[in-house]
Amino acid sequence: MSALGSPVRAYDFLLKFLLVGDSDVGKGEILASLQDGAAESPYGHPAGIDYKTTTILLDGRRVKLQLWDTSGQGRFCTIFRSYSRGAQGVILVYDIANRWSFDGIDRWIKEIDEHAPGVPKILVGNRLHLAFKRQVPTEQAQAYAERLGVTFFEVSPLCNFNITESFTELARIVLLRHGMDRLWRPSKVLSLQDLCCRAVVSCTPVHLVDKLPLPIALRSHLKSFSMANGLNARMMHGGSYSLTTSSTHKRSSLRKVKLVRPPQSPPKNCTRNSCKIS
């Protein structure tokens, strides 16, 4: 509770996502793999609708997700139309071991474009743990997602693989669309090798990397890392660049200035033989 007696919110943003797809693609399995959050809607919902909430961390901010799943059966199309209102993101789900579910994504996209046009979407291939029964090649699904202009994931609720990552990416897309680009920059967990490279190049100019007592392959990686991340930008181009620019400017200025010297008259008592230039 805050000082004024009002409850403190446990999240910074609240988003509503819809999981759409055929009835047997495992959308309920995805929701069941989420341990935290309520499994019942506070507003109540009819049969054929599954609901769950979960909270994710996105660049240090707490984002609460309301996840709604229609059964995917034809008789619930009316329910889908009503629950699609106000949705801020859509998760298109198919079963990688069921070709029919993948071919049905086009039908769901038409429904979404009709009742929730412009809502950000991602494509999710579910049940990756059944890869030995795969009927939808990863390359084909990836090409299909690129044609739609959406992000693609393959997930496994059984292994808890890519579930949170897919939700997090969709939340990032939604918040970026709503003008949160200043706060929601893509985050990256650096590997131990990247951390070591960052520590080295932060105190070593790139032109001195070749002189480090390291294997050639490692020196080459350090140089590439330095140029890619711009950590040596100041040492590479800072003082030397400004000095070169300044001196070049001065030389060009001198060339433009015409020196005018006052006329000099020879001394009165100076002759050709007696006058010497010191």
UniProtKB/Swiss-Prot annotation:
Residues 175-228 form the SOCS box domain. Keywords: Cell membrane, Cell projection, Cytoplasm, GTP-binding, Hydrolase, Lipoprotein, Magnesium, Membrane, Metal-binding, Nucleotide-binding, Palmitate, Prenylation, Ubl conjugation pathway. It comes from the Eukaryota. Mg(2+) binds at D69. GO terms for molecular function: GTP binding; GTPase activity. It is an enzyme of class 3 (hydrolase). Residues 248-259 have a biased composition (Basic residues). Its cofactor is Mg(2+). Residues 41-49 are annotated as: Switch-I. Its EC number is 3.6.5.2. It is a lipid-anchor. Residues 267-278 have a biased composition (Polar residues). Regulated by guanine nucleotide exchange factors (GEFs) which promote the exchange of bound GDP for free GTP. Regulated by GTPase activating proteins (GAPs) which increase the GTP hydrolysis activity. Inhibited by GDP dissociation inhibitors (GDIs). Residues 72-88 are annotated as: Switch-II. A lipid is attached at C270 (S-palmitoyl cysteine). Signal peptide: none annotated. InterPro entries: P-loop_NTPase, Small_GTP-bd, Small_GTPase, Small_GTPase_Rab, SOCS_box, SOCS_box-like_dom_sf. It is found in: Cell membrane; Cytoplasm, Cytosol; Cell projection, Lamellipodium membrane; Cell projection, Ruffle. The keyword Magnesium applies. It catalyses: GTP + H2O = GDP + phosphate + H(+). NCBIfam families: small_GTP (TIGR00231). The SOCS box contains two defined motifs including the BC box that recruits and binds Elongin BC complex, and the Cul box which interacts with the Cullin family of proteins to form a ECS (Elongin-Cullin-SOCS-box protein) E3 ubiquitin ligase complex. Belongs to the small GTPase superfamily. Rab family. RAB40B small GTPase acts as substrate-recognition components of the ECS(RAB40B) E3 ubiquitin ligase complex which mediates the ubiquitination of target proteins. The Rab40 subfamily belongs to the Rab family that are key regulators of intracellular membrane trafficking, from the formation of transport vesicles to their fusion with membranes. Rabs cycle between an inactive GDP-bound form and an active GTP-bound form that is able to recruit to membranes different sets of downstream effectors directly responsible for vesicle formation, movement, tethering and fusion. This is Ras-related protein Rab-40B. It comes from Homo sapiens (Human). The lineage of its organism: Eukaryota, Metazoa, Chordata, Craniata, Vertebrata.
